[in-house]
């Protein structure tokens, strides 16, 4: 079966890693997967196609309005692919009533110019199959499909036992104590809490790096429009000596994150409310680091399994990090068991099987 993925790609954000994995794993399973459009410098290694008739399904991977192609390309898709063979993966919960979580919204007209009803009617005009990467969709008729996944072949360093992992981790001389890779959009409420909480153990932990857009200062566009969500505390960042780096390309994230002892898994408030997963939910476990889970406890159990509870940072950030540094074998045991769980329950081959079942239903 052949799949045409429709989305605007960015080499350091959104679903580009996941799309690359669907192309790779799809070919291994006998499926052709390509991105609709002409080749882009954002992901030049991926296959692209404008030949709509060669594909069985068009799958729209939607974060923003610009993920829908401009005319005449959108018209070609709608005319050339029957509606029952068009699918939308709603990665930001747009196909809901307007939801606010802290100062995070699924509809923000000041930024994209679209009201909530426009998103709902627009989705329904394109497809009758709307999927969201959550186990618990709010809107009737939406199907749960996690979309993102885990590929054990991408694990940066394999270990046979927690003791081996802990010994190498402790002696590795990593460049950073902690690295977070992701843009400064609706992340500061959690990043700020994490940084404030770890301050008592900052010297023991080591250097901290935030890699992505707008970690050096609040962007001018957010100031001018009065939009919350790209906030930060310059004094806190300066006091902790936090390094801000430019965005990391999707195929270098695991390698870069492996340079740190720890890496937090952080979802924006809206995603926590909707229990939505992202590519980092899974791919962080590919890096040679101890993931720190800053997610709702029920979501940790549902996605990662009970063994991952040990990696939840909880309310005592400094105490948790101190214990992780003092007893790394305990936490590497949780990491290795969680990797095994992800490989069994959330592989991309399993995602393909789930997607095929939805399409054929």
Task: Describe the residue ranges of each PLM region.
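Glycosyltransferases and closely related glycan-assembly transferases
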Residues: 54, 69-86, 100-101
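Nucleotide-sugar donor-binding catalytic core of glycosyltransferases
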Residues: 2-29, 35-46, 62-74, 91-93, ...
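A charged, aromatic-enriched C-terminal amphipathic alpha-helix characteristic of glycosyltransferases
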Residues: 325-359
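Short acidic/histidine-rich motifs immediately flanking catalytic phosphotransfer sites
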Residues: 51-59, 260-261
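Short secondary-structure boundary/capping segments
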Residues: 103-106
């Amino acid at each position: 079966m052949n799949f045409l993925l429709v989305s605007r790609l960015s080499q350091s954000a959104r679903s580009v890693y996941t799309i690359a994995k669907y192309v790779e794993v799809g070919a291994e399973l006998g499926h052709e997967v390509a991105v609709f459009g002409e080749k882009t410098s954002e992901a030049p290694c991926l296959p692209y196609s404008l030949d709509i008739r060669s594909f069985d399904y068009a799958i729209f991977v939607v974060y923003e309005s610009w993920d829908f192609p401009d005319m005449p390309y959108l018209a070609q898709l709608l005319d050339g692919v029957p509606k029952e063979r068009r699918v939308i993966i709603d990665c930001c919960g747009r196909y809901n009533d307007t939801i606010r979580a802290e100062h995070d919204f699924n509809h923000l007209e000041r930024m994209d110019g679209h009201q909530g009803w426009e998103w709902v009617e627009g989705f329904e005009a394109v497809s009758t199959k709307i999927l969201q990467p959550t186990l618990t969709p709010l809107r009737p008729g939406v199907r749960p499909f996690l979309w993102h996944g885990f590929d054990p072949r991408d694990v940066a360093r394999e270990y046979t036992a927690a003791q081996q992992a802990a010994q190498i981790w402790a002696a590795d001389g990593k460049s950073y104590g902690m690295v977070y890779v992701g843009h400064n959009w609706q992340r500061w409420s959690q990043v700020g809490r994490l940084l404030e909480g770890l301050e008592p153990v900052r010297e023991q932990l080591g250097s901290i790096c935030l890699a992505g857009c707008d970690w050096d200062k609040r962007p001018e566009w957010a100031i001018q429009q009065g939009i919350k969500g790209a906030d930060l505390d310059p004094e806190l960042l300066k006091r902790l000596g936090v390094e801000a780096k430019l965005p990391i390309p999707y195929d270098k994230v695991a390698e870069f994150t492996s340079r740190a002892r720890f890496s937090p898994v952080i979802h924006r408030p809206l995603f926590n409310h909707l229990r939505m997963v992202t590519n980092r939910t899974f791919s962080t476990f590919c890096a040679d680091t101890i993931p720190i889970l800053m997610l709702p406890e029920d979501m940790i159990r549902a996605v990662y399994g009970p063994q991952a509870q040990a990696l939840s940072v909880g309310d005592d950030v400094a105490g948790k990090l101190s214990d992780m540094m003092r007893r790394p074998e305990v936490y590497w045991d949780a990491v290795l068991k969680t990797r095994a769980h992800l490989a069994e329950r959330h592989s991309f081959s399993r995602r393909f099987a789930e997607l095929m079942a939805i399409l054929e239903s």
